[in-house]
Amino acid sequence: MDGTTWYCGEQVKDLESFDGDNPKLPELVKIDGSFKAGRDRDKPGIIFQADPKAGQVYLEEFSLGNAEDVTEILSTTYKFGVNHELDRGVPKSLAQQLCAGDCVVTRNYSLLEPGAFARKYYAPGIGAFLEVNPKTRDVVQLVGCNFDPKCAALPAH
């Protein structure tokens, strides 16, 4: 074992509520994207390399025609203010709190959705703390954790 984090499957359940529902309870509308390594020729992928290197590209998940996600390592030395492209959509205070030139940034995309991608940001000792869609500016960020002293000072969102 080299410390690489493998991704062996996921169960997706998309729920939706509809106008006029009484009671207004979400209903299961699709399970697209679910996969399990070893079933129906699905393969495990890698969530995070033990020793990431800028330029590496690897499969995050693979279920033919269902889940074909790819990760590309963009940087292993991210620090806010150095690369303006990687800063786009990133909350400055969050990046400054967690990244001292040692964060990993990935570009994640699906072979099934050409042109769509997100960037994910990983901090040492914490892991994934931010996901940014540069086109829509949608941001998903860590708001708390209890296993690293840096988490105590996470900026309010």
Question: Which residue ranges define each predicted feature?
Answer:
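Conserved functional acidic sites
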Residues: M1-H157
